Amino acid sequence: MIKFEDVSITFNTEKATVHAVRNVSFEVNKGEIFGIVGTSGAGKSTLLRTVNLLEKPNGGKVNVDGVDITLLDKQSLREARQKIGMIFQHYNLIHTKTVYKNVAFPMRISGKSAKEISKKVPELLEEVGLSDKAHVYPGQLSGGQKQRVGIARALANDSHLLLCDEPTSALDLESTKSILELIRTINKKYGITVLLISHEMDVIKSICSRVAVMSEGEVVDLNDVYSIFSNPRHEITKQLVRHSLNVEIPDGILGDTEGKIVKVLYRGSSALNPILSNAIRKYPVDMNILHGRIEYIDNQPMGVLLVNINGENNDVVNLIHYLKENTATAEVIHD
């Protein structure tokens, strides 16, 4: 569906040449929800905007449905863009037009008839839950409702690809949840491919099947979302995952804790097994759970626990070895 081949983008400033995207190569499969995550300045938005050529690469290819979009003439590019919907962080609605006219706008630009528009727009507004808002203006809507208008507008020309540029970063938690659920529903119902960027791992975790992690213009990690969370490989990925899982203990608590503190990661079936209770029955140690959580990512369980272990040194060593053998990882983080 989308194939980035050695894509690079540079910007020349008075002081230096900025390498916004560096030699990026990966594919997005048809019908999937694919995420790109990274901190500010990682190159996420710049890369996303190459798909509809709002940013033109200095090098490499961007193939959409087998066509290198960077080589299209103006007319062919206009036609290609009609099938690529885009939603933005700050909605980009026309504030002097009603919700109905905002959704109808791309249809008018593409030459659709008044009959086609009058049939399609109400269907789209019903799809996004805004049938009763057709004749109000954007200024009268909440942030979540504005983004729903943006989604309806992005689908107006029967897009087969939806680009989502930080679609929830300006929303509260409840609106974020509802917008992500709407995107997921549209993806499943119509088979639309979704390429979504975010700086929030929680957004990626809740909706994407695969994710590319970007840092300083490069893709430093790429995997299915469950593997990214349960087995992050790059240090940037590890930092993002740690921040998302938020399994931390204040330094003051660490300083007052005797014995070893072990971070235990459970993956798959091990997250549901009574490993800790088996361990303390097997070895005569005292164990206290300091922090922990179990999550379901892509319908697969993953658990993280921080446990404090006290006892005879040999028993503690043997118990930690037992944990390492029966969980994904067990790491002493404080001794």
Name every feature range the model reports, one short phrase each.
Residues 60-68:
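Conserved ABC transporter NBD signature motif
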Residues 67-68, 104, 108, 115-132:
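Conserved ABC ATPase "signature" region
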